[in-house]
Every structure is written in C-alpha cells, then in structure tokens.
Amino acid sequence: MKKQAIGFIDSGVGGLTVVKEAMRQLPNESIYYVGDTARCPYGPRPEDQVRKFTWEMTHFLLDKNIKMLVIACNTATAAALKDIKKKLAIPVIGVILPGSRAAIKATHTNRIGVIGTEGTVKSNQYKKMIHSKDTKALVTSLACPKFVPLVESNEYSSAIAKKVVAETLRPLKNEGLDTLILGCTHYPLLRPIIQNTLGDSVTLIDSGAETVSEVSTILDYFNLAVDSQNKEKAERNFYTTGSSQMFHAIASEWLQLDDLAVEHITLG
C-alpha cells in the first residue's frame, strides 16, 4: 500500500501547482495526475455536472490503485468532496479547508479576501469554513472567470494577463484586506502579477501548498507514507483529456521536469 501513488485531479493544469508542492514536500511519493482540460473551466458549470466530471476522474484513478485522492481543484472540492469522501475507503482531501485555516492564521486585521471561479464563490464554502473557525473574520469574495483561461492558454505571464488581473481585482483594492486566498489552483501561476496588483501588504494564501502539508500529515497518520529508505524512483504519470502538447508545455515549464510524459485520455 505504501508504494501506491497519490492521485491528484483538477479541471485542467491548475492542480499542477499542488503537484509541484507535493514533489517538494514529498519527493519519494509517486503521483498520478488527471487534468480534465477538454471540459475546463469548471467554474461556470452546474454543480451536479462538476460532481459528475469529478467522479469520472476519480474512477479513472481508482483503477490505477491509488492510496489517497487529492481533489486539487476548488470548484470540484466545493461540489464533490463530501460525496466522494463518504463513498471511498481511501483518504480523500480537498483544498478549501487547508486554505481557510492558513488564512485565519495569517490575518492580523480579520479582513480576508477570497478569489476563485464562479462555482467556488457561489458555493460560499470558503466563507462558511472561515466563519466556522473564526466568527469575527470579515470575508470578501470575488469571482475571477478570466483567470483560468489565461493559465490554460499559457498566457499567465503575458501583458494581457497583467491587464486582466489589474482590471478584475480592482474591486478589492479598497476593501482593506491583509490576506487573500488564491481559491483556485490555477491562480498561483498568476501569483507575481496578483501580488504586484494588490501590493506587498496583502499576504497571498496558496490553498494548494497548504493542502500538501495536510496530505503529509494524513499519510503519516494512516501509515501510508513511502519509507524514507526506499530507493525506488517515484513515478510521475500525467493524463489529460485535452491537448497533450499544450499540457506538456505548461507542465514541463512549471514542474521543471525534463522527462515528463503526458497521456491523452477520454472520460465520460
């Protein structure tokens, strides 16, 4: 069981920000990743459809005999985590709770912002989660529907990205926030531009990076972590429902992997 892979699922390439952190924190762990790029973005889709797509990716990875599932997508976490967690025998974790905890810890003024897809913002999951831990927190949420397409089209460091981010985040500039949750795993690829737009006084919380710390704790708790003496090379397998070339271009740059192999799959 210990040598089995951890499964990661996302609507596209966004979950690679979580995988990057997993490779840093858990270098001996094998990783299977599915990005449903063909049906990305999930944000504008109905919740039941997002749940269906999330289950399709989950079943694909269960066939690979994974030992743990990370829903590395905020929209999918909001729509499907509860259901999947209830029905699977392996540990399952989403990205909303770890991000909320980290934001509460980071804020000094109790003014927390959340940016995410329409689906994540509409679900109100971050606000509910934060208020369940800290009733005094003031939470301001903003949907950023143009951000995911920027990342998926490999435009995340372009002049267009700077313009779109500045325009989209304008409503947050006068909210007095000191902490902002990047409530979509695609958004860390836009992090330098987001930080530059809001200024250094705002602490950015990467929900994906926070999630990996919890993954590590869960692996230890259930005695599922690969032994540190294990000399076998960790596997890294990537699957996409969209263009494997585009996925490869973004993944190899972001993860700094020379031998990255991407397989095209069909779901549903």
From Swiss-Prot:
Pfam families: Asp_Glu_race. Disulfide bonds: none annotated. InterPro entries: Asp/Glu/hydantoin_racemase, Asp/Glu_race, Asp/Glu_racemase_AS_1, Asp/Glu_racemase_AS_2, Glu_race. Its EC number is 5.1.1.3. Pathway: Cell wall biogenesis; peptidoglycan biosynthesis. SUPFAM superfamilies: Aspartate/glutamate racemase. GO terms for molecular function: glutamate racemase activity. Belongs to the aspartate/glutamate racemases family. NCBIfam families: glut_race, PRK00865.1-3. Provides the (R)-glutamate required for cell wall biosynthesis. PANTHER family: GLUTAMATE RACEMASE. This is Glutamate racemase. The lineage of its organism: Bacteria, Bacillati, Bacillota, Bacilli, Lactobacillales. The gene is murI.
